[in-house]
Design a protein with these regions (language model features):
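N-terminal accessory/interface modules of nucleic-acid-binding and processing proteins
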Residues: 1-286
Length: 286
């Protein structure tokens, strides 16, 4: 499948979900066997990233796959297994760095190019010992608290709104008891931490956009996806803040088929950036 067709197919699928009032990156970590599980390659164990996360979550949800482990046709063959007759793969993408000549000069530069390929859920494969399909064990009660503390973010409580203030570099959250559940509080905290990661002293995303603009909607999409990725990583079953942004996301995606890919890439970078703080603490403690 050509990459332009992948852009179109993925964006069309997400638009269809949003028009039904649902966000396709929410349900897989909110219920079912995929709770707390990021999609990963069944052979290498490596988690997928960027747009591939919601693509594979959505595919697992739609088809009712009991696990979020995937592999390529060749990987199945190499293990002496085979894809079941009639099964169709799920198209995902990877970024390949290629070197090209710069104009008429001898200078070279590297550019990123997307390539599409198909993967199959292990439930679509015969002769392969699938990993345990059980849901991930619940995280320690204080996992999100420890995760947030490790970042060093200035988080304050008060009022009835959640937001990040780039000019003074702090997060404001309502008191925990103001939320419908502790999970909703944690999911909201993770959403704001993704915004925090975009500060000019960190990942330097543009955070000074007016409400109602496409740029504002794009940053909210980054925060929403990043929070979903982190909720899966930490095993949080909560409620994301997508409802109020659906109309603006629809407008954004209908104008730009690449917008969801860009947002997912930035969300993955933000999640990786935030996870690194906890990983550094763990390494220091060893």
């Amino acid at each position: 499948m050509k990459i332009a067709a992948v852009y179109e197919a993925v964006t069309r699928s997400i638009i269809a979900e949003l028009e039904q009032g649902a966000a396709p990156w929410v349900k897989p970590w909110k219920g079912g066997n995929c709770i707390g599980i990021l999609p990963a390659n069944a052979i290498t164990g490596r988690c997928y990233s960027g747009i591939n996360i919601p693509i594979l979550w959505h595919a697992a949800d739609v088809h009712g796959y009991p696990t979020n482990a995937w592999l390529t046709f060749k990987q199945a063959l190499d293990k002496g297994a085979h894809v079941k007759k009639g099964e169709k793969g799920t198209q995902i993408v990877f970024t390949k760095r290629v070197t090209v000549e710069k104009g008429d000069t001898d200078e070279e530069k590297q550019i990123s190019m997307l390539r599409a390929f198909a993967v199959f859920n292990v439930a679509q494969v015969d002769g392969f010992d699938a990993p345990d399909a059980a849901a991930a064990p619940p995280p320690p009660a204080g996992a999100v608290i420890e995760f947030a503390a490790a970042t060093g973010a200035d988080i304050r409580h008060g009022g009835d709104k959640a937001f990040f203030v780039p000019s003074v570099d702090f997060i404001v959250l309502p008191d925990p008891e103001s939320f419908e559940s502790v999970e909703y509080y944690h999911a909201t905290k993770l959403h704001e931490l993704v915004h925090w990661s975009g500060h000019k002293t960190r990942l330097d995303r543009d955070l000074n956009n007016r409400f109602g603009t496409n740029a504002y909607a794009a940053e909210e999409l980054v925060a929403e996806l990043g929070a979903a990725f982190l909720c899966a990583h930490l095993g949080v079953q909560g409620q994301l803040r997508h409802a109020g942004y659906i109309d603006s996301w629809l407008s954004l995606l209908k104008k730009d088929e690449r917008a969801i890919f860009t947002a997912a890439s930035k969300a993955s970078a933000a999640a990786d950036y935030l996870r690194a703080f906890s990983e550094q603490e763990e390494e220091a403690a060893e």
